[in-house]
Amino acid sequence: MPLVEAVTASSPSLADLGWSEFFGDQLEASDANLIPTRIAMVHRDRLSGLSQTGQTDLSLAPQATTGDYAVGDWVLVEPHSHLVQRRLTRKTVLERRVQGGRGPQLAAANVDTLFIVTSCNADFNIARLERYLALANEAGTTPVILLTKADTAEDAEAYRKQAAALQRELAVVTLNPRIPGAASALAAWCGAGQTVALIGSSGVGKSTLVNTLAGSAQQSPQQTGAIREHDAKGRHTTTARSLHAIAGGGWVIDTPGMRTLQVSDVGYGIDTLFAEITELAPLCKFRDCTHVHEPGCAVQAALKAGTLDPERLARWRKLSDENQHNTPVQSGPRGAKSPAGRGKRR
């Protein structure tokens, strides 16, 4: 599938492509002749990028692989050979653990907002949404839940309330990806130079939403697929991650659908997601309290007082245990806040 071309008929500025002072501060005098380029598509054997001069197929050094790069990365490229000289440190990075894989898989980089897309049907799954939220929090992006297929649900408002209760100050938007009004509903996150990414199961409307957001800026629309009515499962219509221009001036990254997401190294993301539990942990009598049987446990006290949802606690425990098992080094007691600031930079 071809990439979209420039945002406008004229050459885009670096700011149009998502460049900011964060990346400019990383430039050195020796980089003066290199071209800042944003990775727009990652294939198994090649990369494509966008710069002020347009779309370019990029070359890699012999020791490098495409797996080292994510859509949204900023790289410095030699102008004649199109050889990638180095990658700039990421402002944010979305990555997921692949079942059976040796390490995390890069999903997208330098994303400002993560649209977590689900439907008002059998696809709606609280535990899965919490995993996506932990991923977004850890990455340093702003999560927004998008609810599709509300027109087919008996009580779409009930879905919205369930989603909004998952995390403090969480934005939830109900929309129909097929109508132009969907772009207007998301305009606050899709301004010039802003980058959003879509994540969710197959068949929830991600590719349709990409087409709506891109509008006339996209030359080759994303393929879309129907879902099976009996279980709300869809077909994979997106097989590669790619960067698309949004009609309003921003950028959107589509990702292949995923129904399973293992967590790893998302301690800060879990702490943010379950803030009501995180805030209770320092009040426990013992610093290494597991919140199961210890005397003076503030979490158990809140549970007995009815101010803490037992199902929420059970999901926190399951997610925390999985994260601890999958993370090579885990420091601090369960529930303690991560010492580092928000998000990862690599």
UniProtKB/Swiss-Prot annotation:
GO terms for molecular function: GTP binding; GTPase activity; metal ion binding; rRNA binding. InterPro entries: G_CP_dom, P-loop_NTPase, Ribosome_biogen_GTPase_RsgA, RsgA_GTPase_dom. Its cofactor is Zn(2+). The keyword Phosphoprotein does not apply. Keywords: Cytoplasm, GTP-binding, Hydrolase, Metal-binding, Nucleotide-binding, Ribosome biogenesis, RNA-binding, rRNA-binding, Zinc. It is found in: Cytoplasm. Its EC number is 3.6.1.-. PANTHER family: SMALL RIBOSOMAL SUBUNIT BIOGENESIS GTPASE RSGA (PTHR32120:SF10). This is Small ribosomal subunit biogenesis GTPase RsgA. It comes from Mesorhizobium japonicum (strain LMG 29417 / CECT 9101 / MAFF 303099).
